[in-house]
C-alpha cells in the first residue's frame, strides 16, 4: 500500500494524518542583506488624513485647532485662504488638513521687523479688528519696541478699534 492510498483512507474516515516534514533551513543573511531588509521594512510611511470643514468657536486660535487635528498653523491657513493667521472670526469655516505628515507652523507667519522707523511712511495708524502692536510693527517692518517707544502711555493690551497710534517716521 502506498502512502498516498493510506492518506486517502484516513481522510475518508475523518482521521487527520501528517507526513513528517523536513526541517526547513533558513539562510543566514549577510550583513549587507540584513541591513537592506531592516531599512526596507522599518521605514515608516505617512498617510495624511482627510481635509475637514471646521467652524471657528470662541477661544479658537490656529494653534489650538492645529494641535487638535495634528495639523500645522500654516497648513490650515493655506488650505483656508487665510492671509493673517493671527486673526480668525467666530463662525468662520476653515479647511483643516488632518494628521499632516510634516506640519508647517512657520512659513505663513510674518517675520518680526527690525527697523526703528518707517522711511517716508504714514505718521499714524488707525487700529482695525485683529490689530496688535506686534502685527502693526510687522506689517511696517518695524521693531515692536520702536513702535512702543513712539506710543508712550498707550497700553498695547487695551487697544480698541478706531484708536490712532503713532508710527515712528525717519
From Swiss-Prot:
InterPro entries membership: LysM_dom (IPR018392), LysM_dom_sf (IPR036779)
Broad class of where this protein is predominantly found: secreted
Glycosylation sites per record: 105
Keywords associated with the record: Glycoprotein, Repeat, Secreted, Signal, Virulence
PROSITE patterns in the record: LYSM (PS51782)
Residue ranges occupied by any LysM domain in the UniProt entry: 52-96, 123-167
Compartments, record wording: Secreted
Gene3D superfamilies tied to this protein: LysM domain
Signal peptide location: 1-18
Stated induction or repression of this protein's expression: Expression is induced during the initial intracellular biotrophic phase of infection.
GO CC entries: extracellular region
Mutant phenotype after disruption: Impairs the penetration ability of appressoria in a plant-independent manner.
Protein family membership: Belongs to the secreted LysM effector family.
Quaternary context: Forms homodimers in a chitin-independent manner through interactions at the N-termini of EPL2 monomers. Homodimers are further polymerized in a chitin-dependent manner.
Description of its domains: The LysM (lysin motif) domains are small globular domains involved in binding chitin in eukaryotes. ELP1 contains 2 LysM domains.
Reported function: Secreted effector that enables the plant pathogenic fungus to manipulate host defenses for successful infection. Binds chitin oligomers and polymer with high affinity and plays a dual role, not only in the suppression of chitin-triggeredimmune responses, but also in appressorium function. Does not protect fungal hyphae against plant chitinases but suppresses chitin-triggered plant immune responses.
Other remarks in the entry: In plants, chitin acts as a microbe-associated molecular pattern (MAMP) that is recognized by lysin motif (LysM)-containing plant cell surface-localized pattern recognition receptors (PRRs) that activate a plethora of downstream immune responses.
Name recorded for this polypeptide: Secreted LysM effector ELP1
Organism: Colletotrichum higginsianum (strain IMI 349063) (Crucifer anthracnose fungus)
Gene that encodes it: ELP1
Amino acid at each position: 500500500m502506498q502512502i498516498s492510498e493510506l492518506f486517502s483512507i484516513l481522510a475518508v474516515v475523518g482521521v487527520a494524518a501528517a507526513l513528517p516534514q523536513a526541517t526547513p533551513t533558513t539562510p543566514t543573511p549577510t550583513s549587507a542583506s540584513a541591513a537592506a531588509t531592516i531599512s526596507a521594512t522599518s521605514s515608516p510611511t505617512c498617510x495624511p488624513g482627510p481635509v475637514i470643514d471646521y467652524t471657528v468657536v470662541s477661544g479658537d486660535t490656529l494653534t489650538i485647532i492645529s494641535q487638535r487635528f495634528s495639523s500645522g498653523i500654516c497648513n490650515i491657513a493655506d488650505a483656508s485662504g487665510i492671509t493673517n493667521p493671527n486673526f480668525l472670526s467666530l463662525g468662520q469655516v476653515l479647511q483643516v488638513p488632518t494628521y499632516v505628515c510634516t506640519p508647517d507652523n512657520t512659513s505663513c507667519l510674518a517675520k518680526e521687523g527690525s527697523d526703528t522707523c518707517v522711511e517716508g511712511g504714514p505718521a499714524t495708524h488707525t487700529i482695525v479688528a485683529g490689530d496688535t502692536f506686534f502685527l502693526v510693527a510687522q506689517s511696517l517692518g518695524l521693531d515692536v519696541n520702536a513702535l512702543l517707544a513712539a506710543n508712550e502711555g498707550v497700553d498695547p493690551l487695551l487697544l480698541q478699534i478706531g484708536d490712532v497710534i503713532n508710527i515712528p517716521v525717519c
